[in-house]
């Protein structure tokens, strides 16, 4: 740039000097013509506005030999001519282009700069480089060579940089793209047909594999448990899209089947059950005993249905709604072991008959009736001599009655304020939802409560009167919902996961409240996964670990608290004990739990007594069945000899203290006359000794 400016200054000064020479008729040196030729050939460097005096040099320029082969200047009318000289005439200025440059250059304006013609016939000099017009945008910006195949779709640089190669659209490329898309469009139908065929084949293969698994006659390996093998004969219909899984374990049904098998009872109701009258009006239970039973019920069971005072269940209620009054006395009878079994049995049959009549009564049902139905759903096995009431059916029908009777269920949860009356209804509603969930997952049955109704359950915790037990019920509802969803998700069960993100999130908020239910749900999920992974040692270890945690926790429970447990707790403990019998029958926790259950049972019809007997019989069969030499191979591969004598030192002291515990219960009914407690206390010792002899 500096050289160009210097050239301009020198040229202007020299031209001015030579103008003075011409005006004085002096000779013009040859270098002046060289400068003029330079200006003619390089118009951008020497502007015509800065060397205006050259216009007056017409005489010496036109025929000078220096300009031969260069552009010849003929000047048109110029506005600067009069200013430069008064004697010199001005002619048109035109550019004559050399022969090699053709005639396709026009003068666009007075600047003298040529412009290319729009035609494509320009003849270029032989030595000039012709650049490719197919370079991509990236190579153009980098000013590098674009290594592109004429029919390619990206250059090497863009491929190596993993960026999009943007190419200018040409006629050839457009034709190539059009042909490529036409070929792809023509191939789409055939691809879709092949995909449909592959999907159909995969579906057939999957169904065939399931049938092969279901029809497998035997499973190798000693770690395959008896409970797992018993599930092979269950319904094996497809579980995809269903609301209940045929592969899920059924603890409640399992216990009922085992109990019927071991005891040999018919599990049918007596024919005269419908002709039973009112036990209270007939004087079978005297008024003093009934008052004590109501007090015991309020102390241990009233929290479930918002009954805080015996006056809430007054004597007039026995005439207006005998179902709640009779249910309260039946549940409280477990705290009075001296009540004859015949009386308890008669009460139970009367309540069953009244329940059947109530369920088909005209709607809406009274609040007290719904309270009684919720209690019966929580404790359906109060008497185990006959087939217990089906908690899933009972709670399901009761929920339908509650939807009709409880008006708040027909509104959005945010539309209403939780008051005292709504608290009492919410407690009954939560109890019904919980029992429906427990029985659905315990029997592998569908769960049909809509989500908009379940959203009302946690609203109970918004009221200041909400208790610790209310929080546990809400947490347990959420836990069983998660477990039921995972159990019905067959893909998750087939993967054999050992940790579930949904349960881990639940633990962060509620794990400190519910231990037994958490371990029970994990146990059910592991047992479900074992249907697809028969010999998974990790699953077996997790099953044993959760079973031991359940039994160890249960053995720490205080005796009065254990009697008030809902039946679901006994199913949890019993199922954990059965799993230990299945995989490790020599585990000492089995004997401890069966003795503790026997210790809790007030009579032989109680659920604890029946579960203790079932566990004892199943342990005997598991221990003696696989090996005639009484050697049992556990789930971890260790071998232990079956030796019941090792458990006798533990069992004898505990059995000796049982009568002392029952004797301590007499202070609960000090005013009861001796004739109201016949036979039971005097026969307990003989019955316990007979059972002890049987299990030892």
Curated annotation (Swiss-Prot):
InterPro entries: prtT, Zn2-C6_fun-type_DNA-bd_sf, Zn2Cys6_DnaBD. Residues 106-126 are annotated as: Disordered. It holds the Pfam family Zn_clus. One of its GO terms (cellular component) is nucleus. CDD domains: GAL4 (cd00067). Keywords: DNA-binding, Metal-binding, Nucleus, Transcription, Transcription regulation, Zinc. Residues 136-165 bind DNA. Its main location: nucleus. It is found in: Nucleus. Disulfide bonds: none annotated. One of its GO terms (biological process) is regulation of DNA-templated transcription. Gene3D superfamilies: Zn(2)-C6 fungal-type DNA-binding domain. GO terms for molecular function: DNA-binding transcription factor activity, RNA polymerase II-specific; transcription cis-regulatory region binding; zinc ion binding. PANTHER family: FINGER DOMAIN PROTEIN, PUTATIVE-RELATED (PTHR31845), TRANSCRIPTIONAL ACTIVATOR OF PROTEASES PRTT (PTHR31845:SF34). Transcription factor required for protein utilization and degradation. Regulates transcription of major secreted proteases including a serine alkaline protease (alk1), a metalloprotease (mep), an aspergillopepsin (pep1), a sedolisin (sed2) and two dipeptidyl-peptidases (dppIV and dppV). However, it is not a virulence determinant in leukopenic mice. Belongs to the prtT family. This is Transcriptional activator of proteases prtT. It comes from Aspergillus fumigatus (strain ATCC MYA-4609 / CBS 101355 / FGSC A1100 / Af293) (Neosartorya fumigata). The lineage of its organism: Eukaryota, Fungi, Dikarya, Ascomycota, Pezizomycotina. The gene is prtT.
């Amino acid at each position: 740039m500096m050289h160009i400016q210097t050239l301009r200054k020198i040229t202007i000064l020299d031209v001015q000097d030579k103008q003075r020479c011409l005006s004085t008729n002096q000779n013009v040196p040859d270098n002046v013509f060289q400068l003029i030729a330079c200006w003619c050939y390089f118009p951008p460097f020497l502007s015509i506005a800065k060397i205006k005096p050259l216009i007056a040099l017409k005489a010496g320029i036109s025929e000078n030999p220096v300009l031969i082969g260069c552009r010849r200047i003929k000047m048109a009318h110029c506005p600067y001519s009069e200013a430069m000289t008064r004697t010199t005439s001005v002619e048109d200025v035109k550019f004559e282009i050399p022969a090699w440059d053709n005639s396709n250059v026009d003068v666009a304006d007075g600047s003298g700069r040529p412009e290319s013609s729009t035609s494509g016939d320009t003849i270029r000099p032989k030595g000039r480089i012709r650049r490719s017009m197919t370079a991509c945008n990236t190579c153009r910006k980098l000013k590098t060579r674009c290594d592109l195949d004429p029919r390619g779709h990206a250059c090497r640089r863009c491929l190596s940089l993993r960026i999009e190669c943007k190419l200018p659209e040409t006629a050839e490329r457009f034709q190539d793209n059009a042909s490529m898309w036409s070929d792809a469009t023509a191939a789409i139908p055939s691809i879709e047909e092949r995909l449909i065929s592959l999907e159909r084949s995969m579906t057939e293969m999957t169904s065939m594999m399931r049938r092969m698994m279901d029809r497998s006659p035997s499973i190798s390996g000693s770690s395959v448990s008896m409970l797992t093998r018993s599930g092979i004969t269950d319904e094996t219909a497809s579980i995809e899209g269903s609301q209940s899984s045929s592969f899920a374990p059924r603890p409640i049904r399992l216990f009922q089947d085992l109990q019927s098998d071991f005891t040999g009872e018919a599990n049918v109701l007596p024919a005269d059950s419908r002709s039973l009258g009112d036990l209270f009006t007939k004087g079978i239970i005297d008024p003093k005993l009934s008052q004590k039973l109501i007090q015991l019920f309020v102390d241990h069971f009233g929290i479930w249905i918002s009954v805080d005072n015996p006056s809430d269940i007054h004597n007039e209620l026995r005439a207006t709604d005998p179902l709640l009054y009779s249910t309260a006395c039946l549940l409280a009878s477990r705290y009075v072991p001296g009540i004859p079994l015949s009386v308890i049995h008669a009460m139970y049959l009367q309540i069953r008959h009244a329940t059947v009549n109530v369920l088909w009564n005209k709607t809406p049902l009274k609040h007290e009736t719904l309270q009684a139905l919720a209690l019966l759903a929580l404790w359906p096995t109060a008497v185990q001599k006959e087939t217990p009431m089906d908690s899933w059916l009972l709670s399901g029908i009761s929920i339908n009655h509650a939807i009709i009777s409880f008006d708040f269920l027909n509104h959005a949860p945010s539309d209403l304020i939780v008051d005292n009356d709504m608290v009492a209804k919410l407690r009954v509603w939560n109890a019904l939802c919980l029992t429906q969930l427990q029985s659905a997952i315990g029997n592998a049955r569908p769960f049909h409560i809509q989500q908009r109704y379940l959203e009302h359950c946690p609203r109970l915790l918004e009221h200041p009167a909400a208790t610790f037990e209310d929080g546990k019920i809400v947490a347990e509802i959420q836990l069983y919902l998660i477990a039921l969803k995972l159990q019905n998700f067959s893909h998750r069960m087939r993967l054999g996961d050992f940790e579930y993100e949904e349960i881990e999130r639940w633990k962060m908020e509620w794990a400190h409240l519910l231990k037994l239910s958490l371990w029970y749900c994990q146990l059910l999920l592991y047992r479900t996964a074992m249907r697809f992974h028969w010999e998974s040692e990790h699953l077996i270890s997790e099953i044993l670990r959760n079973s031991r945690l359940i039994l160890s926790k249960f053995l720490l429970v205080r005796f009065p608290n254990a009697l008030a447990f809902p039946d679901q707790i006994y199913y949890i403990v019993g199922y954990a004990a059965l799993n230990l019998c299945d995989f490790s029958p020599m585990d000492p926790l089995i004997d401890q739990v069966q003795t503790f259950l026997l210790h809790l049972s007030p009579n032989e019809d109680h659920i604890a007594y029946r579960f203790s007997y079932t566990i004892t019989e199943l342990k005997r069969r598991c221990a003696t069945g696989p090996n005639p030499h009484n050697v049992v191979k556990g789930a971890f591969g260790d071998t232990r000899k079956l030796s019941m004598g090792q458990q006798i030192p533990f069992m004898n002291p505990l059995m000796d203290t049982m009568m002392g515990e029952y004797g301590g219960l007499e202070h609960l009914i000090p005013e009861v006359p001796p004739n109201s407690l016949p036979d039971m206390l005097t026969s307990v010792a003989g019955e316990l000794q007979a059972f002890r002899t049987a299990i030892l």
